[in-house]
Amino acid sequence: MSSKIILLILMFLSFISKNKSLGIATIVMLFISFFNTEKCITFMENHFMNLGMTFLMIWMLIPIIKNPEFTENIKNAFNLKGIVCFLCGAIVAVLASKGVGFLKGSTDTLTGIILGSIVGVSLLGGVPVGPLIASGIAYEVVFIINLIFKNNC
């Protein structure tokens, strides 16, 4: 029952913050929670991250087919701003890849990332791609802390 209350709170926050993605996600999950079908939940858990990444990648590739001059504009990407954007894109992609494994590592990691991402999305106007990046950054921070203090966080 507590999971339904949390979902209702999130749905309320999504409407207040006008975050359609969080609103739709909470409505879908609330609906599914009433049926408690383990097969459906397991399927979503196993496949939805990859499906979401695929849709995000499709969205990122739209300019290639939408803009006929895209290939000509590639040379313009090698100015200072373009190089900084290229490096940030590469770094974030690597951090996100570290985050995938880190999210699966433990429940305290997953809970903290989820709560932080929900606050970021619902109250601070963020977008819901944060969990992978946040967990990748968290992975690197924990790795550095472990190196410095010889600790096992």
From Swiss-Prot:
Domain of life: Bacteria
Membrane topology: Multi-pass membrane protein
GO CC list: plasma membrane
Regions crossing the membrane: 5-25, 45-65, 83-103, 113-133
InterPro entries: UPF0756_TM
Ranges in a coiled coil: none
One Pfam family, short name: DUF441
Keywords: Cell membrane, Membrane, Transmembrane, Transmembrane helix
Subcellular location: Cell membrane
Family, similarity comment: Belongs to the UPF0756 family.
Record-given protein name: UPF0756 membrane protein NT01CX_1209
